[in-house]
Design a protein with these regions (language model features):
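Short, hinge-like loop/turn segments at secondary-structure boundaries
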Residues: 82, 100, 146-150
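Flexible, polar/low-complexity N-terminal or interdomain linker segments that lie immediately upstream
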Residues: 1-63, 69-75, 149-171
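Short, flexible helix/strand-to-coil boundary loops that buttress conserved ligand/catalytic motifs
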Residues: 77, 93, 143
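Terminal peptide-recognition signature
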Residues: 50, 66, 81, 122
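Short loop/helix-cap segments at secondary-structure boundaries that form the rim of catalytic
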Residues: 73-79, 139
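Short active-site oxyanion
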Residues: 58-64, 79-80, 102, 128
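Glycine-rich, highly charged phosphate/nucleotide-binding loops
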Residues: 84-91
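Catalytic cysteine-centered active loop of the rhodanese-like fold, especially the PTP/DSP P-loop
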Residues: 93-140
Length: 171
């Protein structure tokens, strides 16, 4: 009988096939899981972590890049972010960014892949890059201040995305 597991039989313990889908494919062996999750953290940054780094005294060690259109930027953006629309990365990144400083990209939110496309373009140009999970949507929903063409704004934290009255989720 052929196994449907993505792992060779010798790398995971005997695991009965459950009736529900959660464990129908067994969890990865710990070393493989650690490598996978470490790699995920090499590609992504959390909104709360970015906010904490930007709020701390001194240089956060990265540049935050808003990859949306000018209209979107004016509607609202993270304070201190650099504006470089995805379509202009190849043409303007060299003039706006320092290759020795990591870049964290963001776009509208989880339903938009503009930050992913900008991150790809930057990586292809030789920049170290991560993507901010949740984008501008989650920045606003977590209650962080943002700038608009009319000035600064801030909304209360959405209790479905961030603890109300706390600086971070404690993750």
């Amino acid at each position: 009988m052929t196994s449907l597991s993505p792992f060779p039989a010798a790398t995971h313990p005997v695991f009965p096939v459950p009736a529900h889908p959660v464990l129908r494919v067994p969890p990865a062996p710990p070393a493989e899981a650690a490598a996978h999750f470490r790699a995920m953290l090499a590609f992504h940054a959390d909104v709360s972590d970015v906010a904490a780094a930007l709020a701390a005294d001194g240089d956060p060690g990265f540049v935050l890049l808003d990859s949306r259109s000018t209209e979107a930027w004016e509607q609202g953006h993270v304070p201190g972010a650099v504006h470089l629309p995805t379509a202009l990365v190849a043409e303007q990144a060299e003039q706006l960014l320092d290759r020795s400083v990591p870049v964290v990209t963001y776009c509208w939110g989880p339903g938009c892949n503009g930050a992913t496309r900008a991150a790809l373009a930057l990586a292809e140009l030789g920049f170290q890059v991560k993507e901010m999970l949740g984008g501008f949507e989650y920045w606003v929903r977590e209650g962080f201040a943002y700038d608009t063409w009319q000035g600064p704004e801030q909304r209360p934290a959405d209790p479905l995305t961030a603890p109300v009255g706390a600086d971070d989720c404690g993750c």
